[in-house]
UniProtKB/Swiss-Prot annotation:
HAMAP family: RecA. ATP binds at G65, P66, E67, S68, S69, G70, K71, T72. The gene is recA. Changing R84K: In strain: ATCC 17587. This is Protein RecA. It comes from Stutzerimonas stutzeri (Pseudomonas stutzeri).
Length: 347
């Protein structure tokens, strides 16, 4: 840059700092780049698919899928992981359907969980914004976007047309709270439902509720689907689940994870550790037998997982090695801008 441009830039920066305060404009090279802090989802495979070890703090996340696909279970698992780190969590229950007993089974400390059951969409989003601006809440779940009913619709007659009200409400609210979420370093997760577009001849007819604003403001979007049932004999004890990362601004997108959700304990975590350990060559598999560092740990996946449950230190050791091999570290965060460009591209 020539001297005239340097002087002009220095004058402009000085004027900006004088008018808007120090730090209004920063030079990226003046500060060390740090890895984005994250909160585990409770699923090792999904943490790895997300690229940074979990869901990013200071960002908006959207989780959507069909009914009974595991959306609320996934968010409750995030709350349980955050609470184990000492974080404060809130659940904005617009559907009025939160089951405290089920949340407790998933490891959530329900006594410390902040819960709101708002009457209108405006009230729900205003409560969310106030919790974010308090700088005291680390994780907020909004369940769900489809249940954020505008006040005008609630007060109107059944059958009245209210075109675009919910979409305008979401657009206005997200414009308002996005900056606050970043400043508070708070993770806000919106659960969303799927609807079908009428008359679609090509491509997927599926769409999410609440307009397009959330698709743009979300740094991460997860598509969760139930792909099968987990059975013990004839009894169904869980669900085979697939999650696809359809948008990711903090790591490469379009990865996916498959895992089991057991109805009494959320994710079958030890089973994931065994599967990923075998994939990465950390756990040896010979026929039906599994071994770690030359020692047999069980015949069949269920017995090997039970061994890890009885010896948690070995499970943690294998998990740490898997994370070290597969996750993005602070040393290679220079790939982050590329990931952000890919996430916003029309592919």
């Amino acid at each position: 840059m020539d001297e005239n441009k340097k002087r002009a830039l220095a004058a402009a920066l000085g004027q900006i700092e004088k008018q808007f305060g120090k730090g209004a404009v920063m030079r990226m090279g003046d500060h060390d780049r740090q890895a984005i802090p994250s909160i585990s989802t409770g699923s090792l495979g999904l943490d790895i698919a997300l690229g940074i070890g979990g869901l990013p703090k200071g960002r908006i996340v959207e989780i959507y899928g069909p009914e009974s696909s595991g959306k609320t279970t996934l968010t409750l698992s995030v709350i349980a992981a955050a609470q184990r780190m000492g974080s404060t969590c809130a659940f904005v229950d617009a559907e009025h359907a939160l089951d405290p007993d089920y949340a407790g089974k998933l490891g959530v400390n329900v006594d410390d969980l902040l819960v709101s059951q708002p009457d209108t969409g405006e009230q729900a989003l205003e409560i969310t914004d106030m919790l974010v601006r308090s700088n005291a809440v680390d994780v907020i779940i909004v369940d769900s976007v489809a249940a954020l009913v505008p006040k005008a619709e609630i007060e109107g007659e059944m059958g009245d047309a209210h075109v675009g009200l919910q979409a305008r409400l979401m657009s206005q609210a997200l414009r308002k709270i996005t900056g606050n979420i970043k400043n508070a370093n708070c993770l806000v997760i919106f659960i969303n439902q799927i609807r079908m577009k009428i008359g679609v001849m090509f491509g997927s007819p599926e769409t999410t509720t609440g307009g397009n604003a959330l698709k743009f403001y979300a740094s991460v979007r997860l598509d969760i689907r139930r792909t099968g049932a987990v059975k013990e004999g004839d009894e169904v004890v869980g669900s085979e689940t697939r999650v696809k990362v359809v948008k990711n601004k903090v790591a490469p997108p379009f990865r996916q994870a498959e895992f089991q959700i057991l109805y009494d304990q959320a994710f079958y975590r030890n089973g994931e550790i065994i599967d990923l350990g075998v994939q990465q060559g950390l756990v040896e598999k010979s026929g039906a037998w599994y071994a770690y560092k030359g020692s047999k740990i069980g015949q069949g996946k269920a017995n090997a997982a039970k061994y890890l449950e009885e010896n948690p230190e070995i499970g943690q050791e294998i998990e740490q090695q898997i994370r070290a091999k597969l996750l993005v570290t602070s040393a290679n965060t220079k790939a982050t801008p590329v990931a952000e460009d890919l996430a916003d591209a029309d592919i």
